[in-house]
């Protein structure tokens, strides 16, 4: 057995990569809560945007400092998008204290590389060590991206789109549910692109046909749905499939004005209203989440006003807003008409204020209703209180439901009365 102290930065896809690595070393792995008790310290980094790069580097440097005072120093391994973006050779010259660099070019090779560095004798076998508890788990269905948005570094870091075969994903889904997982959340850079590169006859629907019948699965949630991939055919399949598929749509629209979408390299999404209307044609009561970028090069007051009007009209259930940052190596970083930071930040904050009012109004409708709540974990401070989620709340990104009463425990799916609503959260009693 080896003890591991791990840090996963960035998105859920990184967390899945960490879980696969730790579950595939060919020996039993014991997670520990302090690096002084670890045989190996693993940092899975993010490098998607500059703040993530800075956080990753800061985390590595702070960890090196913490390790320097230990009598027995664990092996330090660094993986993830920071390594993919800057390369192991360049990073090693700046951070020689790191023992092992795990590059993104072949994530499947990580277990063998780490096992070799640890001098482990057991055979490396595919596996997964869950870190999310019994209620939910992410299922990463592909890696990389075939799109070339002008602001995005992902294709250069993660490479082109590569689907994981359906039989592999079905086996993993069955294993996760057998461990007690109630909700599977499908993630990828573009979930709707699954199957395009491996000849799946009906694309994502082919995979869903394999996953939906998994015995014991209570919820199946889809994240990162590319606007162009939400075809009428896919939406029709999803409507007809029904439970355990939840009518939750995470669609990163990024903007609403065609001028800005064109500059973003997303001309296929130049009419986001049609995307929203298409979803609501099939799912009138769908929960809609989106992410938007403000302050993109060339964004004028008129462009921003159009975006604000779009948000007010559409009334998303959940929304994230990001102030644009120029990323080295992307076409957008070289564009003229860069927007001042103070303007970008004001636009972000103002748009989130608009969304806060919308969210509060939409959640208030649920007060007095009865909802199924999937219980995630005990509250850290209040005994007897747990946190969970309704079908319209995705883990770790949306609001939560505070729930208490008989039978409330992690992994339980309970019927509860919504007794109070807040801006982003709910309060429920069984």
Swiss-Prot record:
Boundaries of every Radical SAM core domain copy: 131-361
Cofactor binding, note field: Binds 2 [4Fe-4S] clusters. One cluster is coordinated with 3 cysteines and an exchangeable S-adenosyl-L-methionine.
MTTase N-terminal domain mapped to chain residues: 2-119
Localization annotation: Cytoplasm
First-listed, main subcellular location of the protein, grouped into a coarse class: cytoplasm
UniProt keyword Zinc-finger present: no
Gene Ontology process terms (BP): tRNA modification
Cofactor(s) essential for the protein: [4Fe-4S] cluster
Gene Ontology terms: cellular component: cytosol
Classification via CDD domains: Radical_SAM
Annotated [4Fe-4S] cluster 2 binding sites: 145, 149, 152
One example GO MF annotation: protein methylthiotransferase activity
Function summary: Catalyzes the methylthiolation of an aspartic acid residue of ribosomal protein uS12.
Protein name according to UniProt: Ribosomal protein uS12 methylthiotransferase RimO
């Amino acid at each position: 057995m080896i003890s591991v102290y791990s840090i996963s930065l960035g998105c859920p896809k990184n967390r899945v990569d960490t879980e696969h690595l730790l579950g595939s070393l060919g020996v039993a792995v014991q997670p520990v809560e302090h690096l002084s008790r670890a045989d190996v310290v693993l940092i899975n980094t993010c490098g998607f945007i500059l703040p993530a790069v800075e956080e990753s580097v800061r985390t590595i440097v702070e960890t090196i400092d913490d390790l320097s005072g230990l009598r027995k120093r664990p092996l330090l391994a660094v993986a993830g998008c920071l390594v993919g973006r800057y390369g192991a050779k360049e990073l090693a010259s700046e951070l020689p204290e790191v023992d092992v660099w795990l590059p993104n070019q072949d994530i499947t090779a990580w277990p063998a590389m780490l096992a070799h560095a640890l001098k482990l004798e057991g055979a490396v076998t595919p596996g997964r060590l869950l870190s999310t508890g019994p209620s939910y788990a992410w299922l990463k269905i592909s890696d990389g991206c075939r799109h070339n948005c002008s602001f995005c570094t992902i294709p250069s870091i993660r490479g082109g789109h590569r689907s994981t075969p359906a039989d592999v994903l079905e086996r993993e889904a069955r294993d996760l549910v057998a461990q007690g997982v109630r909700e599977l959340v499908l993630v990828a850079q573009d979930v709707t692109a699954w199957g395009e590169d491996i000849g799946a006859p009906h694309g994502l629907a082919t995979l869903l046909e394999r996953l939906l019948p998994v015995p014991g699965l209570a919820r199946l949630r889809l994240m990162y749905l590319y606007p162009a991939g939400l075809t009428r055919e896919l939406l029709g399949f999803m409507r007809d499939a029904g439970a355990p598929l939840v009518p939750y749509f995470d669609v990163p629209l990024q903007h609403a004005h065609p001028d800005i979408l064109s500059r973003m390299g997303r001309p296929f999404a130049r009419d986001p209203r049609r995307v929203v209307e298409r979803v609501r044609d099939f799912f009138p009561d769908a929960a809609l989440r989106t992410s938007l970028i403000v302050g993109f090069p060339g964004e004028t007051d008129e462009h921003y006003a159009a975006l604000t009007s779009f948000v007010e009209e559409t009334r998303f259930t959940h929304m994230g807003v990001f102030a644009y940052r120029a990323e080295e190596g992307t076409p957008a970083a070289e564009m003229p008409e860069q927007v001042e930071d103070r303007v970008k930040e004001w636009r972000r904050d103002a748009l989130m204020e608009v969304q806060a009012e919308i969210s509060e109004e939409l959640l208030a409708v649920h007060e007095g209703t009865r909802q199924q709540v999937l219980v995630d974990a005990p509250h850290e401070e209040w005994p007897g209180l747990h946190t969970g989620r309704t079908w319209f709340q995705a883990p770790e990104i949306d609001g939560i439901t505070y729930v208490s009463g008989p039978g409330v425990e992690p992994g339980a799916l309970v019927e509860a009365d919504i007794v109070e609503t807040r801006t982003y959260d709910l309060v429920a009693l069984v």
